[in-house]
Amino acid sequence: MARRTEPPDGGWGWVVVLSAFFQSALVFGVLRSFGVFFVEFVAAFEEQAARVSWIASIGIAVQQFGSPVGSALSTKFGPRPVVMTGGILAALGMLLASFATSLTHLYLSIGLLSGSGWALTFAPTLACLSCYFSRRRSLATGLALTGVGLSSFTFAPFFQWLLSHYAWRGSLLLVSALSLHLVACGALLRPPSLAEDPAVGGPRAQLTSLLHHGPFLRYTVALTLINTGYFIPYLHLVAHLQDLDWDPLPAAFLLSVVAISDLVGRVVSGWLGDAVPGPVTRLLMLWTTLTGVSLALFPVAQAPTALVALAVAYGFTSGALAPLAFSVLPELIGTRRIYCGLGLLQMIESIGGLLGPPLSGYLRDVTGNYTASFVVAGAFLLSGSGILLTLPHFFCFSTTTSGPQDLVTEALDTKVPLPKEGLEED
């Protein structure tokens, strides 16, 4: 049977979207709700906030830094067995964490082992999804990533309820059971049968071309800065509210308010990304700027109504930037290099995920509150949005819409030419 030269823009791709939906929920929904466990770990181990912050920080960093491994394995063996293996590792890490007697045990179990499992699930799934869609890519990505918002809405109060009934050890056992569902999600993945382009080259040739691709490198710097501040509210907002004398349950509920807005933001952003003409980078820059501003305003808000309003604004804008961050990548490098490109991008931006939470915790320990933590986090996002201005076609307002072929080929400001790539699917 002849292979397609263009993505089907549907078909089994919608099953892949469903799989990605649950995977994003079980990976980032857990990470975003980990602020509920943060307070428990500080009390249980009698450690400073900066040291406890390393648990989630290591998990985020390993998930992103290990993404090239997941991408390379998916290129060789396909995404299905790789993602299923990742689900087993993620569940095993949470299981071992329930027996932890020190922070080092949590660093190794949640940070290293579960983080490795997440690295094998997220990037291969999104790369597989990108190969199924072209015209509807932003919408499909937005729908897939709504799992993050939906799970954040449900997981934060659910985890708080678990802690009140089973303590943190029993709660981690149940989180381990939830993580096993990643195995079922991986079983649904099936790459489309697209005609191969031998001119693209193997993994080494693709990696070399990307490392000399100016727009791609600038984009990774921008996302690294964004990633440094992006997760701070999900880790420290509950603790910040408790410093303002909020009870634990209402504080966890505010994370659910953020999650609902995040959910709406992802869907709206995915629709706008496909509907608005021009590069998706412009919309990404808009949402990133608004997210940075709302982050910096958190310490200013004191009244409950102001905090709820700010949580709604932050949730919507932070959710809106997420699907576009992945939709921009195929515009820059094409879909033929998406496995390698997405893995490399996740690895480089892991630097931000590694440094952001401990820096925020350190500022809390030094200053005695989270004011500096939120202001600095907002500054990182604003810096990243500034770098997005340098990407190709950002200021191009021609009435003639540039196709993805133009976006890829004209973006190459490198001395090492990229292999020619058939981009008819874009």
Curated annotation (Swiss-Prot):
<feature type="transmembrane region" description="Helical">
    <location>
        <begin position="374"/>
        <end position="394"/>
    </location>
</feature>
<dbReference type="InterPro" id="IPR011701">
    <property type="entry name" value="MFS"/>
</dbReference>
<dbReference type="Pfam" id="PF07690">
    <property type="entry name" value="MFS_1"/>
</dbReference>
<feature type="transmembrane region" description="Helical">
    <location>
        <begin position="106"/>
        <end position="126"/>
    </location>
</feature>
<protein>
    <recommendedName>
        <fullName>Monocarboxylate transporter 13</fullName>
    </recommendedName>
</protein>
<keyword id="KW-1133">Transmembrane helix</keyword>
<dbReference type="InterPro" id="IPR020846">
    <property type="entry name" value="MFS_dom"/>
</dbReference>
<feature type="transmembrane region" description="Helical">
    <location>
        <begin position="306"/>
        <end position="326"/>
    </location>
</feature>
<feature type="transmembrane region" description="Helical">
    <location>
        <begin position="81"/>
        <end position="101"/>
    </location>
</feature>
<dbReference type="GO" id="GO:0000139">
    <property type="term" value="C:Golgi membrane"/>
</dbReference>
<dbReference type="InterPro" id="IPR048233">
    <property type="entry name" value="MFS_MCT_13"/>
</dbReference>
<dbReference type="GO" id="GO:0005829">
    <property type="term" value="C:cytosol"/>
</dbReference>
<keyword id="KW-0333">Golgi apparatus</keyword>
<dbReference type="InterPro" id="IPR050327">
    <property type="entry name" value="Proton-linked_MCT"/>
</dbReference>
<feature type="transmembrane region" description="Helical">
    <location>
        <begin position="11"/>
        <end position="31"/>
    </location>
</feature>
<keyword id="KW-0769">Symport</keyword>
<keyword id="KW-0813">Transport</keyword>
<feature type="transmembrane region" description="Helical">
    <location>
        <begin position="221"/>
        <end position="241"/>
    </location>
</feature>
<comment type="similarity">
    <text>Belongs to the major facilitator superfamily. Monocarboxylate porter (TC 2.A.1.13) family.</text>
</comment>
<dbReference type="GO" id="GO:0015293">
    <property type="term" value="F:symporter activity"/>
</dbReference>
<comment type="function">
    <text>Proton-linked monocarboxylate transporter. May catalyze the transport of monocarboxylates across the plasma membrane.</text>
</comment>
<feature type="transmembrane region" description="Helical">
    <location>
        <begin position="252"/>
        <end position="272"/>
    </location>
</feature>
<feature type="topological domain" description="Cytoplasmic">
    <location>
        <begin position="1"/>
        <end position="10"/>
    </location>
</feature>
<keyword id="KW-0219">Diabetes mellitus</keyword>
<keyword id="KW-1003">Cell membrane</keyword>
<feature type="transmembrane region" description="Helical">
    <location>
        <begin position="169"/>
        <end position="189"/>
    </location>
</feature>
<feature type="transmembrane region" description="Helical">
    <location>
        <begin position="283"/>
        <end position="303"/>
    </location>
</feature>
<feature type="transmembrane region" description="Helical">
    <location>
        <begin position="52"/>
        <end position="72"/>
    </location>
</feature>
<keyword id="KW-0812">Transmembrane</keyword>
<dbReference type="InterPro" id="IPR036259">
    <property type="entry name" value="MFS_trans_sf"/>
</dbReference>
<keyword id="KW-0472">Membrane</keyword>
<dbReference type="GO" id="GO:0005794">
    <property type="term" value="C:Golgi apparatus"/>
</dbReference>
<feature type="transmembrane region" description="Helical">
    <location>
        <begin position="338"/>
        <end position="358"/>
    </location>
</feature>
<feature type="transmembrane region" description="Helical">
    <location>
        <begin position="139"/>
        <end position="159"/>
    </location>
</feature>
<dbReference type="GO" id="GO:0005886">
    <property type="term" value="C:plasma membrane"/>
</dbReference>
<dbReference type="GO" id="GO:0008028">
    <property type="term" value="F:monocarboxylic acid transmembrane transporter activity"/>
</dbReference>
<feature type="topological domain" description="Cytoplasmic">
    <location>
        <begin position="395"/>
        <end position="426"/>
    </location>
</feature>
